[in-house]
From Swiss-Prot:
One of the record's GO molecular function terms: histone binding
Similarity comment: family membership: Belongs to the CHZ1 family.
SMART domains for this protein: CHZ
Name recorded for this polypeptide: Histone H2A.Z-specific chaperone CHZ1
GO biological-process terms attached to the record: chromatin remodeling
Superkingdom per UniProt: Eukaryota
Subunit structure, interactors included: Forms a heterotrimer with H2A.Z-H2B, stabilizing the association of the histone dimer. Also, with a lower affinity, forms a heterotrimer with H2A-H2B.
Assigned keywords, A-Z: Chaperone, Nucleus
GO cellular component entries: extracellular region; nucleus
Pfam families membership: CHZ
Length: 148
């Protein structure tokens, strides 16, 4: 047992230590940039290697009209989404709570519970006064001392 144990490294010998891991910043989607990328890719696809400048100019004019058509389609889609959200015909009036409090589906009779609470408070108040009838007088005497 006099043998010394060889300490093995935690990392394998042939493994590389990773450099700093950079976190990617989260960005919101920017659809304008996406539209620009799409139009550029369409230009590249529709732009064959032509020798004449007239054909190139005609292709550029076509891509402008196509982008106008795409913009019109996007506008129509956005307006359709707005119309779907504003549709009030689907609201079921039986689900609306008229009492003004959230009950998570449970119907509560607030008048009944208020009466029950008042009754329980009266019982506890009467029990406290019966237990110590002179206690209320002592409190009034203490108040008189502080009023001076």
């Amino acid at each position: 047992m006099s043998e010394e144990k060889e300490v093995k490294p935690v990392v394998a010998e042939n493994a590389e230590v990773p450099a700093k891991v950079e976190k990617k910043k989260r960005r919101r989607r920017n659809y304008d940039d996406y539209d620009a990328e799409v139009t550029e890719s369409e230009k590249k696809k529709s732009k064959p290697s032509e020798a004449s400048g007239k054909a190139g100019a005609a292709a550029a004019g076509d891509s402008d009209s196509e982008s106008d058509i795409d913009d019109a389609k996007l506008d129509r889609l956005e307006s359709n989404e707005d119309e779907e959200e504003d549709d009030l015909a689907e609201i079921d009036t039986s689900n609306i709570i008229t009492t003004g409090r959230r009950t998570r589906g449970k119907i509560i009779d607030y008048k009944k519970t208020a009466k029950e609470l008042d009754a329980s408070e009266q019982k506890t108040d009467s029990a406290a006064t019966e237990a110590a009838p002179g206690a209320a007088d002592d409190e009034e005497d203490d108040d008189a001392d502080f009023k001076e």
